[in-house]
Regions:
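Conserved catalytic core of Hanks-type protein kinase domains
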Residues: 48
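Feature primarily recognizes SF3-like P-loop helicase cores of small DNA viruses
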Residues: 3-42, 53-77, 81-168
Length: 168
């Protein structure tokens, strides 16, 4: 919606370096049609979600490094339950979507026409919620903070702002 990228849907990276290069060159990482998540990728996604760096020796040198630092939102798509390790699950919002009934199906061209018609409304609603969450954040209280406490506070502030903005 706000980060157009020629490779907006990517396949599973072969190594962490590929993931971090993608993160350096875009604001949203979208991995499409995954069958499962290998342990090394789960760990790398955790670092990327909360902020981390990747260092590798610079080509044609003995002692120089290239360091890539990034903190990015990530979308994962697959048929099976993808996140199985607790550290990744604690950083995730899991959505299990129903199968689209036959009578509700449409072509991709039709979908995008309908989406473009409401795009300004969607973006406006999202910005209203973010603006409200920024106002609410300092007053948010959670009785028992979970492991990802800052995210929980932000999500709660967004939820409160959404209710106050009457965005559906």
């Amino acid at each position: 919606m706000i980060d157009p990228n020629k490779a907006d849907l990517r396949s599973e990276p072969r190594e962490e370096r590929d993931l971090m290069i993608a993160a350096k060159n875009g604001w949203l990482i979208t991995l499409d049609n995954l069958s499962h998540i290998k342990p090394w990728l789960s760990d790398a996604l955790c670092r990327l979600a909360t902020g981390g760096g990747f260092a590798v020796r610079q080509n044609y040198t003995d002692d120089e490094e290239i360091i890539i630092e990034a903190k990015r939102p990530i979308l994962l798509n697959g048929i099976e339950e993808l996140a199985t390790r607790s550290d990744l699950l604690e950083r995730a919002i899991v959505l299990i979507l129903p199968t689209i009934r036959e009578e509700k199906r449409r072509t991709e061209a039709q979908f995008w026409r309908e989406f473009e018609a409401v795009r300004p409304l969607i973006l406006g609603a999202l910005l209203d919620v973010v603006s409200g969450a920024l106002r609410e954040y300092e007053s948010v209280r959670i009785e028992k903070l979970p492991r990802m406490a800052d995210f929980a506070l932000w999500a709660t502030a967004c939820e409160t702002a959404r209710k106050n903005a009457d965005v559906s």
